[in-house]
UniProtKB/Swiss-Prot annotation:
Keywords: Phosphoprotein, Repeat, WD repeat. Pfam families: WD40, WDR72_alpha-sol. It comes from Rattus norvegicus. InterPro entries: Quinoprotein_ADH-like_sf (IPR011047), WD40/YVTN_repeat-like_dom_sf (IPR015943), WD40_repeat_CS (IPR019775), WD40_repeat_dom_sf (IPR036322), WD40_rpt (IPR001680), WDR7/72 (IPR049916). WD repeats lie at residues 17-56, 62-104, 156-199, 324-366, 404-443, 462-507, 558-597, 1349-1388, 1390-1430. One of its GO terms (biological process) is hematopoietic progenitor cell differentiation. Residues 937-947 have a biased composition (Polar residues). This is WD repeat-containing protein 7. SMART domains: WD40 (SM00320).
Amino acid sequence: MAGNSLVLPIVLWGRKAPTHCISSILLTDDGGTIVTGCHDGQICLWDLSEELEVNPRALLFGHTAAITCLSKACASGDKQYTVSASANGEMCLWDVNDGRCIEFTKLACTHTGIQFYQFSVGNQREGRLLCHGHYPEILVVDATSLEVLYSLVSKISPDWISSMSIIRSHRTQEDTVVALSVTGILKVWIVTSEISGLQDTEPIFEEESKPIYCQNCQSLSFCAFTQRSLLVVCSKYWRVFDAGDYSLLCSGPSEDGQTWTGGDFVSADKVIIWTENGQSYIYKLPASCLPASDSFRSDVGKAVENLIPPVQHSLLDQKDRELVICPPVTRFFYGCKEYLHKLLIQGDSSGRLSIWNIADIADKQEANEGLKTTTCISLQDAFDKLKPCPAGIIDQLSVIPNSNEPLKVTASVYIPAHGRLVCGREDGSIIIVPATQTAIVQLLQGEHMLRRGWPPHRTLRGHRNKVTCLLYPHQVSARYDQRYLISGGVDFSVIIWDIFSGEMKHIFCVHGGEITQLLVPPENCSARVQHCVCSVASDHSVGLLSLREKKCIMLASRHLFPIQVIKWRPSDDYLVVGCTDGSVCVWQMDTGALDRCAMGITAVEILNACDEAVPAAVDSLSHPAVNLKQAMTRRSLAALKNMAHHKLQTLATNLLASEASDKGNLPKYSHNSLMVQAIKTNLTDPDIHVLFFDVEALIIQLLTEEASRPNTALISPENLQKASGSSDKGGSFLTGKRAAVLFQQVKETIKENIKEHLLDEEEDEEEVMRQRREESDPEYRASKSKPLTLLEYNLTMDTAKLFMSCLHAWGLNEVLDEVCLDRLGMLKPHCTVSFGLLSRGGHMSLMLPGYNQAAGKLLQAKAEAGRKGPATESVGKGTYTVSRAVTTQHLLSIISLANTLMSMTNATFIGDHMKKGPTRPPRPGTPDLSKARDSPPASSNIVQGQIKQAAAPVSARSAADHSGSASASPALRTCFLVNEGWSQLAAMHCVMLPDLLGLGKFRPPLLEMLARRWQDRCLEVREAAQALLLAELRRIEQAGRKETIDTWAPYLPQYMDHVISPGVTAEAMQTMAAAPDASGPEAKVQEEEHDLVDDDITTGCLSSVPQMKKMSTSYEERRKQATAIVLLGVIGAEFGAEIEPPKLLTRPRSSSQIPEGFGLTSGGSNYSLARHTCKALTFLLLQPPSPKLPPHSTIRRTAIDLIGRGFTVWEPYMDVSAVLMGLLELCADAEKQLANITMGLPLSPAADSARSARHALSLIATARPPAFITTIAKEVHRHTALAANTQSQQSIHTTTLARAKGEILRVIEILIEKMPTDVVDLLVEVMDIIMYCLEGSLVKKKGLQECFPAICRFYMVSYYERSHRIAVGARHGSVALYDIRTGKCQTIHGHKGPITAVSFAPDGRYLATYSNTDSHISFWQMNTSLLGSIGMLNSAPQLRCIKTYQVPPVQPASPGSHNALRLARLIWTSNRNVILMAHDGKEHRFMV
């Protein structure tokens, strides 16, 4: 899901902070961020300021088990990467700056500790992660790809490692890994950079193994201050050893029988040790432990009792501890170069962080004086101090009298088909509410703030206490009735509700415990089971409840342990239940009999066998994060099933579309633009709601609705009558019966509307009765357009309104803000919106409320001062100053949506349902469609390649549409103003943000993320990405571009130098780039990428290419190669052409702009970069399709686009013929592909490739017309020669050339239109191409003027119909004569300079030719004897020059290029008389 569609989460946290029971802590190297992992699998990022103030910034989701350890994973200053490991073997590499998951993997072992180790190979620095845990070795893992490279193994008594430390040696190249096993044996391995550079080497055995008798070791630390001592902390004592020979230097017992849990060196002579109840002690070491002192090692060999150093300082007083569930986690960190604090950080089970700043404590302090905490904050504290409080999704409807806490939402389900969110609450009530409306109330300011109980909603009451789970079965499978909603509660009951009428249909009371889960059986179960839902309860029972029969058909109880997982075996009619103790029970569904129970390996095999039978039905009950992750990765499946019925299906559209043809073709697109997912960090927490906005789906829905909008006005009966008689398309459909049905529907909508406004709070009795009556009459119900419409509103426009209002950078441009509020109808946010960021594999980071508070106390003061007005000071600017990845996603979204709305007719969000005035203009697209709509924009508007800046063409089009009506002008004016507003919005975000925000705050978009979307499948997103990338490349100027090139050039794959040329056969090409099979890690990668559609840019898995570097199968490596090709291609194409391109292409570029390596003739410059980029692009274009590089992958399309854009730069290094043939091959069927595209929907990959290839051909032809013409002419000659020599085998290009005739003619036509001078220079070659592409029979039948009128514009081309001959004058003074019947061509020479005009006499006997350069007009006699005309013996017609006249030369009107082409023309007035007509009207008459 995150792979290629642009999906942005927005979170509504609610007032209660998520549970965060801390299990591990890390401070990043720059000292700016604390990372904490918790027992529920989330990771929290906390900002730490220089004054040691802490503010929680984001929560990272992705792990499905408790976090066991965290470690840094990168040593370079600009990147802050952290690696996390969880109890079930998952490892993730995170970018701490923005919470992106860079890489993830899952091993079959649990790590309990990870250490980062960096070494240099040559001038490259590589990182490794040394992991230890519940396995008897140390694994060495690559820090960027997370691949296991090799392991450190014990020969002598191998055992689990309990703690480990890396000792860096500055003197030698060898580093030492010291580890202590669980049994107290010290192990030493030597790691050299040579070993580390290798991959998959043999395991490395230990150098030394020595028992030091330290049981239950908690931590092992090396003294960085002296480089000589080791501190080992065990649960009952701690010891200091000499790192040279591991002899004991001193020892300390535990205080008051407490258990030590860790320790570290504070300075050369002090250690800090902490206990499991959170107390810490600082000890001063005796002189015998200090290498600098004379008495160093003086105590070696003494009995342990004699070595106790005194306590120097107790850190934390016991009295201010609060009760915690489990022991707190304590870690000591001391800063690196620029960051000198020494900090002790402690995290506990309530999500509280405590920090002590341990400066070098002066010796004079008393031993009993406790050091106070510097900072102490919990997640809940951070939530509580925010004003306004963080909002929950339905807080305004959950107010409890006399309490400031709203009712908690305990279960939720979203129904995308109706845009409704169903929330179960802790008091047992269930609320059904429009999701976008309630989110608007929580996030944005507007009139809704004045309304109590807005938006209109429905309350279902039936459970006596907390609702624990909700299920809408129709969403999972269409076999269920769409009225049914199922809920389970702590009152042991399961209730079936009718969501349309709000009544309770049935209550099941079959369980003896609270309901923990509701599931849907898979499709292929028996007919009876298919209408059941499966309920799981805390009394360890499972029930199958039939919705049809309203009874429980099977109850599987008697399980001894809680139920962990439910699996299905439909073919054998088995329900398989897995319990927490590892046992499995197999039940027969029809009879309810227990078939068998199994334990151990048998149980595992039974569960795995079920997976094979029903792969999709993996329902883990254990952990909320698992469900979230599955929901995310499988979202496309769910979305396919619950495809929201578009507004297309509503009201008038169905009636106005011509029934037979259109109705079947109305496009159904599989994604929903909004998904609401409830997540819990812990089972006891209330729901947090995440709104996922799918930008591409939203754009498609907007465009589809725009395209489907009928042209008929449906305001009142009068208008209906008028419409049926009007010339409006679609009006004629509205005859008798149709109009009656339409009325009925309009009335329904109005009734529905009025009714729902009465239903603001609780329903009246009679209202309910009436509803029941309606329900009982099935015909009546069937005629309703949309039963759940609680209030009339356009879901798509509302989603866009909510989304755009949250994304816009408010407060930077007051004029534009006014336009947004008044003209476009956007709303300002109450407070900073918490966005999220999705990354690979369903991992996501969600910003916590108040993430931007860490700017310090200034903002606080400002906010206090401005409390009287709305506190929107820092509201909007937030997201563009957070991180580069967030900026990229948000800019792409807002620009692509603004452009989409701009291309629509009057797309404003004003005209809300709040205003109930009778004259209000309806919202565009609401069912009453009361405004005459404009026709949808012409598809060429969608297809144009540049960012849509001006709204003018749109308004011009609508003006034409409205020409009949007088009242159109005000509507037109508003339409124009709205489009202008969207245009300004897009322009501001595209280019003006850096200046408005200031470069200090602005986080520029990531070039690589934009590059990956250079050819996004959604055209609007694609255009936004291209505009943003080019704007950013211009902004960073030459120095920045140079830096970008230097960064990415190393990733450019090195392809073979011989690019495939036309002579090479397909088989040779196959062998040349034979790709290794996708086996081993490659296969694994492909498996786990199931959430990436084939549209992801890495699908050109370039790792199949021979490279200089080691072959890496890491996803990130492949992605970097793809990105490097795109980025270098874009920079080369846009900024690399030294030669001034033709004026038509783009603005001229001055030579100073050329990035190093892309210039053509810059004196001896290194132009190998252009060559390598060009090789990569041509390789991607010409590489035959394979599983690794599908025929229409994104990366291939990107290569096509960039070859076209930068042809002038690449031309010297490419085989032009092969490239043009490759492009022609792709667009040979373009007409067919592009004919059946649906307005608004993304193009199919094949059509998209064809469209890109077409565009590239046009760009290449207009950039270098001679290259294009000569290459194609050469191919034509080769082809005709081959065709003549029938024995020769078919060339591989034959079919391409033949199939692409139409495409070649299209390009030639563009050239004649735009570059006539270039065409005339090569007119004979052009004519050769045209003669090849046109069907001879067609020309004979219709004549050249009709078949290809463009070429007949030239005075030096003449066609004689009766003998079917064409004469073409060439630049070098010869004339080519084509005979269409024989396909032969003959050349005559008679002039010294270019031919200005040629013309056949009316009877075809004479040909007049004129050249202005040598000022001669010649007459040629055509041999038209009977034999000649039959073409006897295939002889060429005899031609002889019978007369030549001298003519005064004609002067061109001005030195412009086109004038030279139209100097003079020849006009025959009779069979023997001809006039030479000059451009200025002078005539010369001649007679033959």
